[in-house]
A protein has these predicted regions:
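Catalytic core of membrane glycerolipid acyltransferases/transacylases, capturing the structured
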Residues: 35-36, 78-133
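Short, charged beta->alpha transition segments
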Residues: 62-69, 110-113, 136-142
């Protein structure tokens, strides 16, 4: 597998791509750090799933320490829910951690369907359409995963964290589906906090896009480059105690429960 931004655009927009000047392709290649990403792919050729995730972290010189793994029960089916600070390395770090613990055959991670293009990880991915109607086939696959014996990993925000008006970097609203599914399939929820930040430029760009009234999150194109910018970094995963599925009663709406779990995850950042 090799990343080629010109080829990717040509396959998606064959007519429009003919009119895009060569310097634009070269600029985009530099923006997403195409050469450095291809180095990660090259050095981990032949690896898939958690083995690829571990290899990618090693190539980038990234270390991820885990605290609280003892909070995970020895048996059971769980939904691991995490904040989404980075939009790349956090997912890779969690796949490396959970894949090592459970094995790739017993892990499925809910992701934006565009990430299915990352072939070395598609064996643990469960695609969700974030920008269109969810196909019946995709919905059935998600339902089957929850009903089965897989451990499920998800970033309920769907998008990586943004900077708020108060200057704090936090996830946007958490989607309620993990609450409904945990109740439906009797799965306890395990809260996970992942440390880390993207660059100041990323957050400023996101704010500027919003000021312009552009709804589509065009800053997504910056995320591959953000991953490379974080090379050599040290991150931390904090695992909390399971939240029984019976906690999510009708006393509150599923959306309210989702925000309560989200607050719990951020509280874990300050726990010693």
């Amino acid at each position: 597998m090799k990343i080629d931004i010109r080829e990717a655009i040509s396959s998606k927009l064959p007519k429009a791509s003919r009119w895009i000047p060569g310097f634009v392709y070269r600029w985009l290649a530099r923006l997403i750090r195409q050469d450095e990403l291809n180095r990660v792919l090259c050095e981990n050729r032949g690896k898939t799933g958690s083995a690829f995730a571990e290899g990618a972290l090693h190539t980038l010189g990234v270390s991820v320490s885990v605290m609280g793994e003892e909070n995970i029960p020895a048996s059971g089916r769980f939904v691991f829910v995490s904040n989404h600070p980075l939009g790349g390395l956090d997912g890779i770090g969690l796949i490396a951690f959970l894949g090592k613990r459970y094995g790739d055959d017993h892990l499925r991670f809910l992701v934006n369907d565009v990430l299915m293009a990352v072939k070395p990880l598609d064996n643990v991915f469960l695609p969700i359409n974030k920008y269109g109607s969810q196909s019946r086939e995709s919905m059935r696959a998600v339902d089957a995963a929850y009903a089965g014996d897989f451990q499920i990993g998800t970033f309920p925000a769907g998008l990586c964290s943004r900077e708020g008006r108060d200057g704090r970097v936090r996830d946007l609203e958490w989607k309620k589906s993990f609450v409904a599914k945990s109740v439906e399939t009797h799965r306890d929820v395990i809260p996970v906090y992942f440390s880390g930040l993207n660059s100041r430029f990323f957050y400023k760009f996101a704010k500027f896009r919003k000021k312009l009234g552009i709804k589509f999150n065009i800053e997504l194109i910056l995320l591959p480059g953000e991953m490379v910018k974080n090379r050599g970094s040290k991150f931390e995963i904090r695992v909390g105690k399971p939240i029984p599925w019976t906690t999510f009663t009708s006393a509150r709406r599923s959306g309210e429960w989702a925000e309560i779990v989200k607050d719990k995850v951020y509280d874990m950042a300050d726990e010693q």
